Amino acid sequence: MANYNDQCGWEGNWYQIGLSASYPFTGYYDGNGYTIRDLKMLDKNAVGASLFGFVNQAIISNLTIEKATITGYGALSAIVGAVTTKGGSINKTFIKGCIVKKSTIESRSDGVVTDGMAIGGIAGMVDPNVNLWIDSCSVEDCTINGAIAVGGILGGGTVYSMTQITNSHNRNTKVTASYNCAGGIVGYADTLYVYSCSNNGSIKGAASTTAPPGNLPANSIYNVGAGGIAGGSGLSTIISSRNSGTVQGSRGVGGIIGSTLVTTQPKTYYNNTFIGFCSNSGNINGDSYIGGLCGEAQLGAYKSYNEGMIKANSSFAGGILGFAPLASITNTANFNKVIASSYSGGIAGSILAGSLGINTNLGEVASYHEYAGGMIGRAGNTLAMNYCSNFASISGSSYLGGMIGEVGDARKWTIMD
């Protein structure tokens, strides 16, 4: 990279390298430690607005972008807009050692963000059949806004995409998604692996009163997903990562991951996520399904803890997990207060089936109405619990327990039972 590294004094828009999915950048780019300043792309209808708009089987490394201003419709970031594929084969792209500082990246708006998806600091969108690996990257003191799938490092990974993010960090970058999936590291990714990442920026998901954008199907899920590391995901594994930023949203809000909700019609289904060796110290709050590590998912959690205060304005709040139809939680601990209108637990608001082993709660648990327990507010019929302990007070109006507020579904017993 030549030592010509800013747009100072030029008022025009940058035209991205790799103008479209048909003509992507393919190859190796080494920024050699240089910094590009004052990059500007201000087209509200742009897709792929970024230094590299569309890339395919590329390696991009060792580059810093500072004081960029990028506005468009979707697949936006400072480094790579969209990672694409050709011919249906699995293609790999690698982004390493890139930094974005003091920049603003946002989807189009007329004073208020109205639409736009896949907005990130390092990469915007990952297409199907793409394996993207982002390593040793960071965003610092930035503002990233959009409607759907907005993340500090990566915005969104589509179905059949595979994303690995390792050793990457969000430092004081504010991330906001007005409809779905805001994350300190990734907004949403289909198949996701995260290792040794951190966030201390504030994360804001949708408000409960936010109406869906007009370009979504009528049966779409919205107002879901906000997380310190990931807003939402398909199948995901998150290891050795931590959040210290505040996270707020409507449904499915967590210190590590928000929600893996797939659908609520005709039945409710979740994807699986595993969280290991992770921690949260940020305050987590929202309307429902709020957890210190995970808001709602089919969850496996191991050797992880929460130190932030957890609050659900409505129901399902837990020091580790808000709600899961199926969960296995082992060697976890909660150290702060958990509050909900109903269904609050030191470890989980509610789990329908699964197991808890060697878990500890030291935070006060309170339900303004019903179902509060030192471990779980309300448990289903098929839950095993061993070597768990609660050392904090439990309060509420009904269905309270030192370990579990209530166990089992209501049944009418007959003589045949």
Predicted regions and their residues:
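Surface-exposed repetitive/solenoidal architectures
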Residues: 1-417
